[in-house]
UniProtKB/Swiss-Prot annotation:
GO terms for cellular component: plasma membrane; proton-transporting ATP synthase complex. The keyword RNA-binding does not apply. The keyword NAD does not apply. Pfam families: OSCP. F-type ATPases have 2 components, F(1) - the catalytic core - and F(0) - the membrane proton channel. F(1) has five subunits: alpha(3), beta(3), gamma(1), delta(1), epsilon(1). F(0) has three main subunits: a(1), b(2) and c(10-14). The alpha and beta chains form an alternating ring which encloses part of the gamma chain. F(1) is attached to F(0) by a central stalk formed by the gamma and epsilon chains, while a peripheral stalk is formed by the delta and b chains. It comes from the Bacteria. The gene is atpH. Belongs to the ATPase delta chain family. F(1)F(0) ATP synthase produces ATP from ADP in the presence of a proton or sodium gradient. F-type ATPases consist of two structural domains, F(1) containing the extramembraneous catalytic core and F(0) containing the membrane proton channel, linked together by a central stalk and a peripheral stalk. During catalysis, ATP synthesis in the catalytic domain of F(1) is coupled via a rotary mechanism of the central stalk subunits to proton translocation. It comes from Staphylococcus saprophyticus subsp. saprophyticus (strain ATCC 15305 / DSM 20229 / NCIMB 8711 / NCTC 7292 / S-41). Its main location: membrane. Transmembrane segments: none annotated. This is ATP synthase subunit delta. Keywords: ATP synthesis, Cell membrane, CF(1), Hydrogen ion transport, Ion transport, Membrane, Transport.
Length: 179
């Protein structure tokens, strides 16, 4: 489904960009994604229910998502027709990735032993921006006492580990090689 999700996301992204409503589309799709998170199992059950024909699934979309913009509603109707409503979250993730690339931004998770101050987070954000060339970073600070000290930063698929735990692990590997 990952490839299918990317195709739906790309089509919606391109359509929104061409119509000059990309930011509005992102906001609206984010709202829908949040709303369906807790109902995903029900959507998958609706997809799998052989007693629900195409028209019933389309009517469901029209009733539940009738207030959304036309492009998003069209995509949701196609998802209903193809029994893919249970994949809204995957499509949203792929759409969000495209949106973040377009706006040169990404999420960063900063793990530390204690809650970092706004000043510390701001300093780390500037370092991340310099290393990744991103213009905007959305930061989450997670507490991880296993690090012993220091921080570990995850941005996309990249990890920058400046923790004492990592330093000790590297020392251990060096000692093993020396033997």
């Amino acid at each position: 489904m990952a490839n299918i999700a990317k195709k739906y996301a790309k089509a919606l992204f391109d359509t929104a960009k061409d119509a000059d409503i990309l930011d509005d589309m992102y906001d609206e799709f984010s709202t829908i994604n949040e709303a369906v998170q807790s109902e995903n199992k029900k959507l998958q059950a609706l997809d799998a229910d052989p007693q629900k024909d195409v028209e019933q699934r389309r009517r469901f979309v029209s009733i539940v998502f009738g207030q959304t913009n036309q492009y998003l509603q069209n995509m949701l109707t196609i998802l209903a027709s193809n029994r893919h409503l249970g994949h809204i979250h995957e499509i949203y993730i792929a759409f969000e990735t495209l949106y973040n690339e377009e706006h040169n931004q990404d999420y960063a998770v900063i793990e530390s032993v204690y809650q970092l101050s706004e000043e510390e987070l701001s300093s780390i954000e500037e370092i991340i921006k310099a290393r990744t060339k991103l213009s905007k970073i959305m930061i989450t600070n997670k507490i991880n006492p296993e690090l012993i000290g220091g921080i570990r930063v995850k941005v996309g698929t990249k990890v920058m580990d400046a923790s004492i735990k990592n330093d000790l692990a590297q020392l251990e590997r060096q000692f093993i090689r020396v033997k």
